[in-house]
Amino acid sequence: MDKLRVLYDEFVTISKDNLERETGLSASDVDMDFDLNIFMTLVPVLEKKVCVITPTIEDDKIVTMMKYCSYQSFSFWFLKSGAVVKSVYNKLDDVEKEKFVATFRDMLLNVQTLISLNSMYTRLRQDTEDIVSDSKKIIEIVSHLRASTTENAAYQVLQQNNSFIISTLNKILSDENYLLKIIAVFDSKLISEKETLNEYKQLYTISSESLVYGIRCVSNLDISSVQLSNNKYVLFVKKMLPKIILFQNNDINAQQFANVISKIYTLIYRQLTSNVDVGCLLTDTIESTKTKISIEKIKQTGINNVQSLIKFISDNKKEYKTIISEEYLSKEDRIITILQNIVNEHDIKYDNKLLNMRDLIVTFRERYSYKF
């Protein structure tokens, strides 16, 4: 929103100076909210008349769009004259024209984002009731699983809730904003503050394309040295995944994915319970974190459920992001060494090549760390 405000101010300043000079009239007071509503109405019209607005849209298309934007619709020139944005563009020198086009393009792109946020904002409100119902059911299932004393009892819980689990997974995997909606149930700031919504959207929105790519990458891992555990949980997952629409529509081998996930789970459990290096790393991290986090502050907050926990994390997000970042960066080399040793020991391959954990982690950090 701050960037949009700067772009809007630049647009208004250039426009007012030229309009007043050419007409001899004085501009009215500026009302940004009023004008943004006008732009939000204009953008779909411009896209229909000219073309879709993208970061790579050509300058001549932007200039064409200027012909359809009349200044008399905006607060600072309301009903004064029939001048269009292109008439101001025509009065500028070449350097000014280039800057004006860039400003107008970026402003339209930011308005486009605002339209998307408004739409999501509306849907978040509408979907809250369903999300609350789903969340309660999920918590209930987890509670029953934790209370199960045998594998058969836990399997029965999963079987009894089979239809709900499949329908919920289909909803989650078909809606890139589903995770965001679940968070909105517990953190009301997403409903009341659009800037917070935009920040969370960048962090928690996951596209179907990204999911499919990630699932394929995991499926293609070769972990043949780890024995497959065909327990009842794995059998349940294997029966369930073929019914997931994302797997059906993208021709993903559900059995292969389930097998790899089972092996990864077995491997992680084994490392957590028997790998001395992993144990030392976790202990050192916990001890180091204790010196940076105020336990008293957490106690005073009175965290007693998921909602209060998410609110606490949201309110202290910057502080904990800094702590996590410092902890990770100070231990990155150690983490990579431990993971590479595990990969080497179990001969884990992708595309017939041994996984290079340093390349993988550094690439991920460089591409996606800005989100976190």
Curated annotation (Swiss-Prot):
Residues spanning the signal sequence: none
Localization per record: Host cytoplasm; Virion
Record key words, sorted: Host cytoplasm, Virion
Pfam families xref list: Pox_A6
Xref: InterPro entries: Poxvirus_A6
Record bears the keyword Zinc-finger: no
Principal location class: host cell
GO cellular component: host cell cytoplasm; virion component
UniProt similarity note: Belongs to the orthopoxvirus OPG132 family.
Entry note about domains: The N-terminal domain is not required for crescent formation but is required for virion formation.
Function: Lipid-bound viral membrane assembly protein that plays an essential role in immature virion (IV) to mature virion (MV) transition. Functions in both crescent-shaped viral membranes formation and its enclosure to form immature virions. In addition, participates in targeting mature virion proteins to sites of virion assembly to ensure their correct localization.
Descriptive protein name: Virion morphogenesis protein OPG132
Gene name linked to the record: OPG132
